[in-house]
Amino acid sequence: MVLEAVEEDDGWATNRVALGKVILGNLDGVEAGVRQMIRKAPLEVTKVELPSGAEVTVPTLEEMLRIKAFLVVRRNQTRDYLDVAALAVVLGVDRAAEVLGQINEYYADQAHNGDGVASQLVRQLGDPRPADSQVITQLPSYRRLRQEWKDWDTVTETLGAVAARMATG
């Protein structure tokens, strides 16, 4: 999308492309760079009032879920799977699946193969294989992790339920 748009300009000459990150080139003899955005829509935020009376702007729970789910696809780390499972329980599996079923409206297809983020997410949530899988055995020793999430089977059951619901719509 971005690459095609800049290459349509007669004065543009592409030098290097790092997909999903940056396009470097020349625009009428001037070195230029364009950052490719992975988001297709702005963050959904809400204001929260702190006990002090100050207000902070934070992502909505649904947005937090989308961010963490995208990180599952992008980073494939245990901590992201844990966060998706925990947020799915807070929102409810049906609502979480509904939110994640629409993730393609928020994030661009990073693989550029037409499958979209949602398809890859269903695969990864349905069969979680984090790149840092050695961390899974350490979950019981995490001090501030809620007891239910120290059991990887609980995490995978929750993620599997979300994936199944996403797949069936």
Question: Whereabouts are the PLM-identified features?
Answer:
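Compositionally biased terminal segments of proteins
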Residues: 1-169
